[in-house]
A protein has these predicted regions:
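Short, Lys/Arg-enriched N-terminal segments with co-localized hydrophobic residues
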Residues: 1-16
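Sec-dependent N-terminal signal peptides of Gram-positive bacterial secreted proteins and lipoproteins
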Residues: 19-44
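Bacterial lipoprotein signal-peptidase II cleavage site
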Residues: 38-65
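Phosphate-group recognition and catalysis centered on beta-loop-alpha active-site segments
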Residues: 47-48, 54, 76, 87-93, ...
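N-terminal low-complexity, Pro/Thr/Ser-rich intrinsically disordered segments
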Residues: 70-110
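A cross-kingdom marker for long, charged
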Residues: 319-383
Length: 383
């Protein structure tokens, strides 16, 4: 359910499935799942987890920006403080209240072979109060764009009762089987131990399919932190764009992301759950914090650091094949589609602010690499 933090659920330094990236790339969908799980009473509140967790949220975020644009806010209200639920009731655009606010996420000005340009920004789907107001370069990129391109627009789907009802049905087994029958004893044991750190017993999740269990883990992590999906970059920009009447372009869709999570094989989730062995609440919170620190400074390569030989030693060849399948579906195949969408928009001369998860831009096979191989140039924005 979550897509999508690339799960911080990996062992420290264990990146075989690039799980932490999940957290960053599909958290949009995770927000809907969070709401569903909380409505079922399966996600413990702060009294159950001994934490000061925040209430579950229902939306997510991703973002990117440009370097040469300048512009004024398109409406009256100010973004001088972190966005809260009231932002959806305002008609405010993002405003230029600060230069960087100590936040300098990776952002590019991309130019096509024909000379058309686009501003691209790497987002983080759950952020903190300290991220607002947004950096001036980001606000300028938003204010000067005619179109906001995002992975998907969850703001309307999350309020669709029928859609959420159908999604809830897909979270549960309907064949009289249970979780322990679909994953290995090793994976089940690792999950059971990890959930204990959150004051949960795995028996509470036996009726849920692996993708719903995975999302529950992400939900627990976010709720017990300073992060909030409502303050995520995508969610903030989407809410603002709707209020401003700005056109929104979905590179993917909520259905696409949900279907991907739902249809991952049991083998993928088994490997994912096994990676919780040795993990604790604190180690996962620190892993998420480390990713956030990297995002703040524009260090996107950290999201895709490779395993060394020692880290890979504990994995079988079959595990490595499963991890490769996961990474292709979660990251590299989507990168190709995202790059193609960007090229199509630029070929039409559209004035677009293109905001997707930061990990999608990183390294070989990332969006920037794919665009450059097709003859596009990408200039990193200097704040």
């Amino acid at each position: 359910m979550c897509d999508i933090l690339k799960h911080t659920t990996m062992k420290t330094g264990d990146k075989i499935m690039k799980k932490i990236h999940r957290t960053l790339s599909l958290f949009t969908v995770a927000a809907m799942c969070t709401a569903l799980l909380c409505s079922c009473g399966e996600v413990p509140d702060s009294s159950q987890t001994d934490s000061s967790s925040k209430a579950a949220t229902t939306t997510t975020a991703d973002t990117t920006a440009d370097t040469t644009t300048t512009g004024e806010a398109s409406s009256t209200a100010s973004a001088t403080s972190a966005p809260d639920s009231s932002v959806s009731d305002s008609s405010s655009a993002v405003t230029d209240d600060t230069k960087t606010n100590g936040i300098t996420p990776a952002m590019w000005k991309v130019t096509s072979p024909e000379g058309n340009t686009m501003v691209m920004l790497g987002s983080f789907h759950a952020l903190k109060d300290e991220c607002y107001p947004l950096p001036e370069a980001v606000t300028n990129a938003y204010n000067n764009a005619d179109i906001l391109a995002v992975e998907c627009d969850i703001t309307s789907t999350s309020e669709d009762g029928e859609y959420m009802k159908n999604l809830m049905k897909q979270m549960l087994y309907n064949d009289n089987t249970k979780l322990s029958q679909h994953i290995s004893e090793e994976a089940y044991s690792a999950l059971q131990t990890y959930l204990g750190y959150w004051g949960m017993d795995i028996s509470a999740l036996e009726v849920y399919r692996p993708w719903a269990v995975s999302s529950t883990l992400d939900t627990l992590l976010i709720q017990d932190s300073d992060f909030d999906t409502e303050k995520g970059l995508d969610n903030f920009l989407l809410t603002t764009a709707h209020a401003d009447g700005k056109e929104i372009y979905e590179v993917e869709s909520v259905d696409f992301q949900m279907n991907m999570l739902i249809n991952f094989s049991d083998d993928i989730y088994d490997l994912m759950f096994r990676s919780f062995e040795g993990e604790t609440k604190e180690s996962q919170k620190q892993a998420l914090e480390d990713l956030y620190t990297a995002w703040k400074s524009g260090d996107i390569e950290t999201f895709l650091e490779e395993d060394n030989e020692e880290e890979l030693a504990g994995y079988t060849e079959e595990d490595k094949k499963i991890a490769e399948d996961y990474n292709n579906q979660m990251l590299y195949d989507r990168n190709k589609n995202m790059a193609k969408a960007a090229e199509d928009l630029m070929s039409q001369g559209k004035n677009v602010f293109y905001v997707v998860g930061a990990a999608h831009y990183a390294g070989e096979g990332g969006i920037i690499d794919l665009l450059e191989k097709d003859g596009y140039t990408a200039e990193r924005v200097q704040y």
